[in-house]
């Protein structure tokens, strides 16, 4: 039920979502549950009476094999982590891995491999459109300028996001299941070390966001002084 832009069922939905976070029930994240680096930020957001998180990712690096038909799924991760890594993981150091193999043209049956850094993304349901618009402004001021609002009269979702990312085709999985990388091993090492810088900046933006949202929670929870008479009003003015 919606009255003047306020979703009166929000409290019930928030209670259900928070109970799910405490249990083993999967959320809307690809992993099915939040990753630990983002827990402190989630705690702050969920302490606000007008917000609740619905899905999240603190940021990650990955080496991903596309599906046979990239539009229909079927891909998988060779490596994925929510932490910075300066050293190559064992899967990329295997003696069967071939580096510096650049095909002259696309080969049918090969599946592309992508290297990616993805920044923090967070979806927050809000009690009202006004709450969503305010949260959007706060997030944008902290470096999450691609933040947007999705929703209807029944539900408002703020997608907090930023453009701090890398997405690079680096190789292929052949029809015979061989890993062939277009780049050299040295360049692969460079990508992993470069991602450390991205993780650092991503963490800085998350810290700024957490600090600003803590202030918003404090303001929201602070009791308002009731004016008892006209003299109080004149003093306030």
Swiss-Prot record:
It holds the Pfam family TYW3. The keyword S-adenosyl-L-methionine applies. InterPro entries: tRNA_yW-synthesising (IPR003827), tRNA_yW-synthesising-like_sf (IPR036602). Its EC number is 2.1.1.282. One of its GO terms (biological process) is tRNA methylation. Pathway: tRNA modification; wybutosine-tRNA(Phe) biosynthesis. It catalyses: 4-demethyl-7-[(3S)-3-amino-3-carboxypropyl]wyosine(37) in tRNA(Phe) + S-adenosyl-L-methionine = 7-[(3S)-3-amino-3-carboxypropyl]wyosine(37) in tRNA(Phe) + S-adenosyl-L-homocysteine + H(+). It is an enzyme of class 2 (transferase). GO terms for cellular component: cytosol; nucleus. The gene is tyw3. The keyword Ribonucleoprotein does not apply. It comes from Schizosaccharomyces pombe (strain 972 / ATCC 24843). Keywords: Methyltransferase, S-adenosyl-L-methionine, Transferase, tRNA processing. Belongs to the TYW3 family. This is tRNA wybutosine-synthesizing protein 3. S-adenosyl-L-methionine-dependent methyltransferase that acts as a component of the wybutosine biosynthesis pathway. Wybutosine is a hyper modified guanosine with a tricyclic base found at the 3'-position adjacent to the anticodon of eukaryotic phenylalanine tRNA. GO terms for molecular function: tRNA methyltransferase activity.
């Amino acid at each position: 039920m919606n009255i003047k832009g306020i979703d009166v069922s929000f409290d019930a939905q928030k209670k259900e979502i928070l109970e799910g976070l405490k249990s083993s029930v999967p959320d809307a994240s690809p992993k099915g549950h939040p990753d630990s680096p983002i827990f402190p930020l989630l705690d702050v957001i969920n302490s606000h009476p007008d917000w609740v998180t619905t899905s999240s990712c603190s940021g990650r690096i990955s080496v991903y094999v596309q599906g046979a038909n990239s539009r229909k799924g079927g891909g998988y991760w060779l490596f994925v982590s929510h932490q910075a890594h300066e050293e190559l993981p064992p899967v990329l150091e295997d003696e069967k891995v071939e580096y510096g193999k650049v095909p002259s043209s696309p080969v049918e049956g090969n599946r592309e491999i992508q290297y990616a850094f993805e920044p923090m993304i967070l979806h927050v349901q809000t009690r009202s459109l006004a709450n969503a618009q305010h949260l959007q402004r706060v997030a944008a001021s902290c470096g999450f300028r691609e933040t947007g609002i999705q929703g209807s009269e029944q539900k408002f979702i703020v997608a907090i996001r930023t453009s701090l990312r890398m997405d690079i085709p680096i190789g292929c999985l052949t029809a015979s299941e061989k890993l062939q990388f277009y780049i050299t091993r040295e360049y692969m090492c460079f990508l992993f070390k470069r991602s450390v810088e991205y993780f650092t900046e991503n963490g800085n933006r998350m810290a700024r966001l957490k600090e600003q949202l803590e202030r918003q929670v404090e303001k929201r929870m602070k009791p308002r002084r009731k004016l008892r008479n006209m003299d109080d009003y004149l003093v306030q003015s």
